[in-house]
Amino acid sequence: MVGSGISALGLLLLMQGSVDANGIQGFFYPWSCEGDVWDRESCGGQAAIENPNLCLRLRCCYRDGVCYHQRPDENMRRKHMWALGWTCGSLLFLITSICLFWWARRQDMLHLPRFLHRKCSKLSKTVSSLSKDRRSANKSTTVLQSPGGEVETAAAVSGEDTGGEE
């Protein structure tokens, strides 16, 4: 169970890393082209400004004829940490629940408490009597006429085989 959770988390990080080619570091420290226009540092010099493809190959940002460096994206980093925290917390809760259930079953502790046992036994008797009433209501009497003209009466229960000869 733990292995499958770790594998799923590794796959998530690998897939995210293949998108922006930063790998796991790109997950924990994402970069972005967003931000204040005045805080941009130029990237690639004049050649990158004249050739947007060169700017992008240098893994820089290009906008409005300006090639500039990417900057750390704190909002995305917070979102990634939040998602990672919830994923790990949920996985830990799931593993703990499974282990606790397994332990309780081995200790033979999966019984109802005494104060609930009486209430549930009364409830099961009520449900049992209701199901008996339902079965008796489903019984019906059918009249069959044989080829010789004799009339036969047969009791049929819906959903059950009567077990008689044909």
Swiss-Prot record:
Domain of life: Eukaryota
GO BP annotations listed: hematopoietic progenitor cell differentiation
One Pfam family matching this protein: TMEM190
Membrane topology reported for the UniProt record: Single-pass type I membrane protein
Gene Ontology terms for molecular function: identical protein binding
Main location: membrane
Disulfide bonds: C33-C61, C43-C60, C55-C67
Stretches in topological domain Cytoplasmic: 103-166
Distribution of this protein across tissues and organs: Detected in testis and in a mixture of spermatogenic cells at various stages (testicular germ cells). Not detected in heart, brain, spleen, lung, liver, skeletal muscle and kidney.
Subcellular location: Membrane
Gene null: resulting phenotype: Mice are normal with no alterations in fertility, body size and behavior.
Transmembrane segments: 82-102
Protein name (database record): Transmembrane protein 190
Organism encoding this protein: Mus musculus (Mouse)
